[in-house]
Structures are given as C-alpha cells and as structure tokens.
C-alpha cells in the first residue's frame, strides 16, 4: 500500500513538473486528428486524476483502519497476557462464593433445627406453666376456703399458742431428764470406782450422792408440778371453749324456743366456772334453777358470736380468782380432782398421773448407812408421762 501511495504521489509530482514546463502551442491547423487526440488525452488525464484522488482518500481511510486494528491487536495481546491471572482470580472468587453458599445452607438448616427445638421446648414450658397455674389456683381456692372457715369460726382464745408453749416446755424437760440420767450414771460410775479404790470414802460419797440426788429430785419435782399446772389450765380452757362452741352450734329451731333475753341470762348463769390455782384447776358447771328448784331452759339457744366471746371472757376472768391451793414442796401426796381421772371432751380427754411415791423406785443401791430420802418421781414414770402427752397432742 505504501508503494502504491508513493507511485501516485510520483505521478502527481510528475504532472506538476510537466505543468511547469512551457507549453508548446499546437497548431490549429494541423488537422482534425490532432484535435481529437488532444481531447482524448485531456479526458484521460482528468479521469486518471480523479481516480488518483479517490485512491488517496481510500488509502487514508485504510491507514486509519489499520491503525485502529493495530491498537486492538495490541490490546488483545495485553488482555491475553493478563487473562491467565484474571482467570485464577475468577476461579478463586468462584470457589469462595461456593463455600459461602454451602456455609449459608448449613447455617440455614441449623437455624431451622434450632427454631424447631425452641418451638417444642416452648410448647412444653407452656404446658408446665399451665399445670402450675392450675395448681396455684387450686391452692388459692383452698387457702381462701380455709380463711373463710376461720373467719366464720374465729378462735375464742390463744389456746393453740399455749399448747405449743407447753410442748416446748415438755421437750425442754425431756432434755433436762436426759442430762440428769447421764449425771446419775456418771455418779454411779464414780461411786463404784471410789468404792474399789478406797472403802473409807464410801460414807462421804454416799452423803454427796444423796445431796445431789435430793437437789435434782427437788428440781424434777418442781418442774413436774409446774408442767402439771400448765397442762391442767390448758385442759380446762379447752373444755370451756368446747362447751361454748356446743352452745353456739345448737340448731335454729331450739333457738326459737326461748326468748333472747332469758336465754342470754341462762347462758350467763350457766357459764363455766374455771378455778385455777398454782398446780391444779377445777371446772364446775352450775345449771340455773327455778324458784321451785328445777332446771329451766333445757335447750339453750346459740348466742351471737360477740355475746359468746363476752361470756367466755367473763368466765375466764372469774375463774382466775377462786380456789387457790398451796404448793406441796415437801413431796407429800395431794388430792387429785375427779376431772383428771375421767374422760372429757370425747376425743380430747387428758389423764394426769398421780404423784410419785418414794416406795416405787430408788436412784441407787445403798450398802452402808442408808439415809432417809424424800419422795422422788421415778424416771421411767416421767418418760412414760411425756410420751403420753406427746401422743395425745
């Protein structure tokens, strides 16, 4: 292509050179043939000139296209050189994307499994919560019913607290009794050792033993009388309360039989007289009598709760000031009340034992110079009494 372009340029240059040469005039009179040949040459020259211009334009266009193609070829070569590195990067990116997709699928499956487990556990917990709520409602209803029952039947005194205090006293006395037994066993062991080592110290040990036993017996006897007094007082208080409750629970038909004022007076006259002393208590019930000496109003109506409470308080206040007795510290026998040896209150009957005697048991064997001992309560007797009290409670 360059050679052709150069030829064209040479032709043009040659044409220019010919133009510069002086034109020799042609004679007009040479003939028709010379004119025709000259015209043919001119037309041929113009045609060749036109073709040369077209070829120059085409050559310039082709040169531009060649340059564009060369640039594209150079770019393609550069792309081919960098394509190996790009492919490796693309492969790495693809593998990474694939791994990320696999991890995403695994995490999605784990999430679905966890959601399923959570839904099942939530369902189980909801069932347990519903069951607990049902149990709580049942307990609330039971507590409310118990509160309603307690409000309808309020206690007239604090006999439950007194009973609990008596139980605590009994437990303390049992512990003291165990300590005294242990002390007695230790004293017996010491006495035997002293007898084996030195017979002359027998009298002194006997005297000391008797003194200790006398002190311990006095303590046990005083504790016994104190416990008996508390138990008798508690027994009579419960008996009075039971009597008042029986009067309160009489049917409504019997309530209409007597006038309210008369029945209240009869209830005041028929109230329990509670006699409390230091160690014993007596319970006496006096039925109201008519002027002819006959009892009136056999069917006692049930008073109101407030009236019953007032009457019980009056009976309790009157009972604390009557029939006091002295404390038998010397260990002599005392006269038991008839209410202790018989059953009362159907299921709540209490039986108190008779006081211990000196002839029942002794604390130790005396071989030489026996001294007179005071009346001591036997240990097994007190244990049996405590067990009976616990069983009856």
UniProtKB/Swiss-Prot annotation:
GO terms for cellular component: cytoplasm. GO terms for biological process: dendritic cell differentiation; dendritic cell proliferation; mitotic cell cycle; negative regulation of canonical NF-kappaB signal transduction; T cell activation. Residues 217-258 are annotated as: Interaction with TBK1 and IKBKE. Its main location: cytoplasm. Residues 321-340, 345-393 are annotated as: Disordered. It is found in: Cytoplasm. The keyword Lipid biosynthesis does not apply. Keywords: Coiled coil, Cytoplasm, Phosphoprotein, Ubl conjugation. The modification Phosphoserine is found at residues 319, 354. It holds the Pfam family TBD. Residues 1-198 are annotated as: Homodimerization. InterPro entries: TBD, TBK1-IKBKE_adapters. Residues 40-198 form a coiled coil. Adapter protein which binds TBK1 and IKBKE playing a role in antiviral innate immunity. Activates serine/threonine-protein kinase TBK1 and facilitates its oligomerization. Enhances the phosphorylation of NF-kappa-B p65 subunit RELA by TBK1. Promotes TBK1-induced as well as TNF-alpha or PMA-induced activation of NF-kappa-B. Participates in IFNB promoter activation via TICAM1. This is 5-azacytidine-induced protein 2. It comes from Bos taurus (Bovine).
């Amino acid at each position: 292509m360059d050679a052709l372009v150069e030829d064209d340029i040479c032709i043009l240059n040659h044409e220019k050179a010919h133009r510069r040469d002086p034109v020799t005039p042609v004679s007009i009179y040479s003939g028709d043939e010379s004119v025709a040949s000259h015209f043919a040459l001119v037309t041929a020259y113009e045609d060749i000139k036109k073709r040369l211009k077209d070829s120059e334009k085409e050559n310039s266009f082709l040169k531009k296209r060649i340059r564009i193609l060369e640039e594209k070829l150079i770019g393609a070569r550069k792309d081919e050189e960098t394509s190996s590195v790009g492919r490796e990067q693309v492969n790495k990116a693809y593998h990474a994307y694939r791994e990320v997709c696999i991890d995403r699928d695994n995490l999605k499956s784990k999430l679905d499994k966890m959601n399923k487990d959570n839904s099942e556990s939530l369902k189980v917990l909801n069932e347990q919560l519903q069951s607990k709520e049902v149990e709580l409602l049942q307990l609330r209803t039971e507590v409310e019913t118990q509160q309603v029952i307690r409000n309808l039947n309020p206690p007239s005194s604090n006999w439950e607290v007194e009973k609990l205090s008596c139980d605590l006293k009994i437990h303390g006395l049992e512990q003291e009794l165990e300590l005294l037994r242990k002390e007695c066993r230790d004293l017996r062991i010491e006495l035997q050792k002293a007898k084996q080592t030195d017979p002359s110290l027998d009298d002194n040990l006997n005297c000391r033993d008797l003194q200790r036993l006398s002190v311990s017996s006095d303590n046990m006897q005083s504790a016994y009388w104190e416990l008996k007094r508390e138990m008798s007082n508690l027994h009579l208080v419960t008996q009075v309360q039971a009597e008042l409750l029986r009067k309160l629970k009489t049917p409504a038909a019997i309530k209409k039989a007597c006038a309210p004022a008369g029945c209240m007076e009869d209830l005041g006259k028929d109230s329990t007289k509670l006699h409390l002393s230091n160690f014993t208590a007596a319970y006496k019930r006096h039925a109201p009598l008519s002027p002819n000496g006959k009892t009136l109003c056999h069917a006692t109506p049930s008073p109101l709760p407030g009236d019953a409470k007032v009457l019980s308080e009056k009976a309790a206040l009157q009972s604390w000031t009557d029939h006091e007795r002295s404390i038998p510290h010397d260990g002599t026998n005392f006269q038991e009340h008839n209410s202790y040896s018989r059953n009362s209150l159907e299921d709540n009957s209490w039986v108190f034992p008779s006081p211990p005697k000196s002839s029942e048991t002794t604390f130790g064997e005396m071989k030489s110079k026996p001294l007179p001992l005071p009346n001591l309560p036997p240990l097994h007797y007190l244990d049996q009494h405590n067990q009976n009290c616990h069983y009856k409670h």
